[in-house]
Amino acid sequence: MLQLLAAASPIDHVVDWPIFSANGWWILTNHMVMMLLAALLMVLIFPAITRHYADGKSVPTGSRNFLEAIMVYIRNDVVKPVLGDKTDNYISYLWTLFFFILFCNILGLLPIDLLTGKILGLGHHGNGIYGTATSNFWVTATLAVVAFVVIQLTGIKNLGIAGWAKHFLGGAPVFLAPIMIPVEILGMLVKPFSLAVRLAANMTAGHILLAVVIGFVAMATSGIGMTGGFLVGIPSVLGAVGIMVLELFVAVLQAYLFTFLTTLFIGQMAAHHGHDDPHHDENPGHPQAVSGH
């Protein structure tokens, strides 16, 4: 929380800052470093879990057990009910998507500025490298574009180019094409846009709220002295702790929502493959599962 007190405004710790720049171009920024750190953690953690099984230790312990429980839940309870037999075709991507967003979200809550700023002297004006990369719209937009490409490639793979193009009619007669095609294209583009905006907005709003609450202490101290700062500080700090707990919940929730909605959109494109299949409706109890023919 120290960077929040030191910030000149509530958004100083949310916006991206250049660490190295040349000729006006930002070469390396806070958010780039935070994304690299999240990726590094994934590279270090998940191969270790794989080696654990390769060594014949089939029973996970400690943090491995926790991470495996999350992975099993995502596969069996989030992805498989939607994608069915095609789950294994997409699970690696969806696992990577979930944990990358989750790690970026959680790293933004950790006070690593104490190490990078006070000890190493890095970051914006030496205040340290910190920030939530997923509060940056361009980061979330990139994740959404990748999801968009995966979704459309799924449609092309299942339907072929002609079938994929035909699905823009939405099952309507050809004479309605001038109306249906623009509507379908708009809907196709709105999906990734909503993914990007939802994640960035939620991660940004929480940090700004936390900065405002903590900022009450500094404003009270400068306005009415140390006594006033102390009196205002007690409820402010308690409120900030509550917000931090809420932020942790939101960090997990937003990673889950992004992954879940991406899975649904993939499932919608994959499900088109079964529309002309005479056995498509044989299992009415599980209409959301994609048949893996």
What is the predicted function of each stretch?
Residues 1-293:
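Selective transmembrane helix interface/packing segments
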